[in-house]
Swiss-Prot record:
It comes from Lactococcus lactis subsp. cremoris (strain MG1363). The lineage of its organism: Bacteria, Bacillati, Bacillota, Bacilli, Lactobacillales. It comes from the Bacteria. One of its GO terms (cellular component) is ribonucleoprotein complex. Belongs to the bacterial ribosomal protein bL36 family. This is Large ribosomal subunit protein bL36. Pfam families: Ribosomal_L36.
Length: 38
């Protein structure tokens, strides 16, 4: 899980979602692409 000021989808499978008011990227294809805005 990377925590960065701006989150962007890295590949075609990345999804941008909101959880508890936080913007996150989840990726079923490549778990390294997981990000959270912080």
């Amino acid at each position: 899980m990377k925590v960065r000021p701006s989150v962007k989808p890295i590949c075609e499978y990345c999804k941008v979602i909101r959880r508890n008011g936080r913007v996150m990227v989840i990726c079923p294809a490549n778990p390294k692409h997981k990000q959270r805005q912080g």
